[in-house]
Amino acid sequence: MIKTLYKPFQRWSEKGSVYLISDTHFDDSDRPFMGYNISEKEQLYLIKENCHKNDTLIHLGDVGNPKWLEQIKAYKVLVMGNHDETATQFKPYFDEIYTGPVFIAEKILLSHEPIINGSAWYNIHGHDHDASKYKEWKVDGFAEGWNDLNLASNVVDYKVYNLGKGIKHGLISNVDGVHRLTIDKARTK
């Protein structure tokens, strides 16, 4: 269990690992223009290779066609992105849906778009498809001196990020203290 998480979110890690990904854009017509160089089927295989039945998969928005996610047996959480039109279309495919950013721990904010914060918290997000900005990205850790982690699929080579490993390897070690904010009331399901 990831004890760093606020109590309501600890259940995500009770039986397995917590994985995150963003911007899968399954079946989106503009997918090739965003630097995607693998098929949806190949991308799904990479997700399923790590994320299993007892795990939790947190998708940080811009899902595309959610039917692709039926093949993933994990508990699924969505933080909606700018291409995700309504929560209603995703309810059959996700166990929890958040319409905006959510603090899952004192120093960890999940969002679709990056939220500039200085060093108050660590922002895990997607949205930015420019991989050249994120050369120091590491699957099991974090980039030294960075307070954000961009998990847009094409930026992270279509791999899911293991949150527990990231925390263990110092994900939030260079973040100053933060007071609990109340924007995590965006839950819709």
Where are these regions (language model features)?
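Conserved beta-sheet core of the metallophosphoesterase superfamily
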Residues: 77, 84, 88-189
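Short helix-loop-helix/strand-helix junction enriched in hydrophobic and basic residues
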Residues: 61-62, 78-82
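Short coil/turn segments at beta-strand junctions that form active-site/ligand-binding loops
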Residues: 15-16, 53-56, 74-75, 106, ...
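Hydrophobic alpha-helical membrane-insertion segments
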Residues: 31-32, 71, 90, 136
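N-terminal active-site segment of His-dependent metallophosphoesterases
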Residues: 1-68, 154, 163-168, 189
